[in-house]
From Swiss-Prot:
A motif (Dileucine internalization motif) lies at residues 12-13. Highest level of expression in placenta and testis. Highly expressed in adult and pubertal testis, but not prepubertal testis. Lower levels of expression in brain, liver, heart, kidney, fat and skeletal muscle. It comes from Mus musculus (Mouse). This is Solute carrier family 2, facilitated glucose transporter member 8. Inhibited by cytochalasin B. Gene3D superfamilies: MFS general substrate transporter like domains (1.20.1250.20). NCBIfam families: SP (TIGR00879). D-glucose binds at Q162, Q268, Q269, N274, W394.
Length: 477
């Protein structure tokens, strides 16, 4: 065994085959960390009720025009892309716990700036700050949870990251019914504040502590999280933290998971989910549902329910099966949604949203049928996304990278995800103008089909494996 080999010197924390940890505090620690994803879910969902509220106001009150509204929805993803870079840097230097604590600062500050906004630039600045926090939380929370969880529950706890994201989105939708945009921003300060309080009492991950040569602290963390360190294999004495070097990209244990991680994030965003969630109210308004806010809340409830189902079956069904099933469902649902717009393309429209067609011009029986096609395909897409392509890319990102490159590698993946989210969100309307709405949704269906092929041919199964066994798989050991 060579002490210079980072693969051989990283800590091995895994229980023996005959014993499974039963500590319950790991669930409390995971909940505390998952309040970060809850916060960034709220930040994502905030734009949906806030934009209509800000566009309804009359001068001299603060009001958003069309271009400013587009940036208000999209700028959070730019901040999140920068947050992905910052989070990758913090992850290996400040540690997992401190990184989560630090990300509460831009969350609270950003929502406070929005609350006090007197002009559009303050609104955009506040959104940029919350986006920065979103990027850090979306990277650090999955890593923290995957490193404190034992294999038997890692899929369940890791899926709770996405569950908290969609819960945050739903919370923003529901609160948007009764709260004006300023008070809605005040509510956005609550989850990160609660995370700050809870995380102060949670331990650093044992794996990170071992890279810092803090053996006693690592064992204390194990006892706190799992109830006892008894039965666990003693990690190698020479375990130490190794920095990222470009030469490491020649190793299959590095470049293979990096390609997979980046591809997962690209396919997740090309499914069109963020465009749909950012413009949920507008899309349902164009479909002529009487209460578009109610339709958006319905979508949020479906997303929460099916993400919860995915979390419960993740460690039984496995990652690959759920990804493939999710992709197939999204192909059919987006194809159907595109068909809805194709059937209505020749009708006159008074819409201001890229020529989307009101179904009210049709006879009543046709109108009802088309309305059900629209809402049915949208809900089917959300359900399909929630059981696979919603939670699993984040879960796999936290599982497939070796400890010594996790900060840089996950940072690259998160940067990719949020940059793609910005492009899709900002340019979705332009694509709909260029290809027509039906063409835009059929294009997303094609990307979903490619994601199924990618899953079946490239993505490995990590169910039931320790993080070290996953690394060994990529190394061919």
């Amino acid at each position: 065994m060579s002490p210079e080999d980072p693969q051989e010197t990283q800590p091995l924390l895994r229980p023996p085959e005959a014993r499974t940890p039963r500590g319950r505090r790991v669930f409390l620690a995971s909940f505390a960390a998952a309040l970060g994803p809850l916060s960034f879910g709220f930040a994502l969902g905030y734009s949906s009720p806030a934009i209509p509220s800000l566009r309804r106001t009359a001068p001299p009150a603060l009001r958003l025009g069309d271009n400013a509204a587009s940036w208000f929805g999209a700028v959070v993803t730019l901040g999140a892309a920068a947050g992905g870079i910052l989070g990758g840097w913090l992850l290996d230097r400040a540690g997992r716990k401190l990184s989560l604590l630090l990300c509460t600062v831009p969350f609270v500050t950003g929502f406070a700036v929005i609350t006090a906004a007197r002009d559009v630039w303050m609104l955009l600045g506040g959104r940029l700050l919350t986006g920065l926090a979103c990027g850090v939380a979306s990277l650090v929370a999955p890593v923290y949870i995957s490193e404190i969880a034992y294999p038997a529950v890692r899929g369940l706890l890791g899926s709770c990251v996405q569950l908290m994201v969609v819960t945050g989105i739903l919370l923003a939708y529901v609160a948007g019914w009764v709260l004006e945009w300023r008070w809605l921003a005040v509510l956005g300060c609550v989850p990160p504040t609660l995370m700050l309080l809870l995380m102060c009492y949670m331990p650093e991950t044992p794996r990170f502590l071992l890279t810092q040569h803090q053996y006693q602290e690592a064992m204390a963390a194990l006892r706190f999280l799992w109830g006892s360190e008894e039965g666990w294999e003693e990690p190698p004495v020479g375990a130490e933290h190794q920095g990222f070097q470009l030469a490491l990209l020649r190793r299959p244990g590095i470049y293979k998971p990096l390609i997979i991680g980046i591809s997962l994030m690209v396919f997740q965003q090309l499914s069109g989910v963020n465009a749909i969630m950012f413009y949920a109210n507008s899309i349902f308004e164009e479909a002529k549902f009487k209460d578009s806010s109610l339709a958006s809340v319905t979508v949020g409830i479906i997303q929460v329910l099916f993400t919860a189902v995915a979390a419960l079956i993740m460690d039984r069904a496995g990652r690959r099966l759920l990804l493939a099933l999710s992709g197939v469902i999204m192909v059919f649902s987006m194809s159907a949604f595109g068909t809805y717009f194709k059937l209505t393309q020749s009708l006159p429209s008074n819409s201001s949203h890229v020529g989307l067609v009101p179904i009210a011009a049709e006879p009543v029986d046709v109108q009802v049928g088309l309305a059900w096609l629209a809402v049915g395909s949208m809900c089917l897409f959300i359900a399909g996304f929630a059981v696979g392509w919603g939670p699993i890319p984040w879960l796999l990102m936290s599982e497939i990278f070796p400890l010594h490159v996790k900060g840089v590698a996950t940072g690259i993946c998160v940067l990719t995800n949020w940059f793609m989210a910005f492009l899709v969100t900002k340019e979705f309307s332009s694509v709909m103008e260029m290809l027509r709405p039906y063409g835009a949704f059929w294009l997303t269906a094609a990307f979903c089909a490619l994601s199924v092929l990618f899953t079946l041919t490239v993505v490995p199964e990590t169910k039931g494996r320790t993080l070290e066994q996953v690394t060994a798989h990529f190394e061919g050991r």
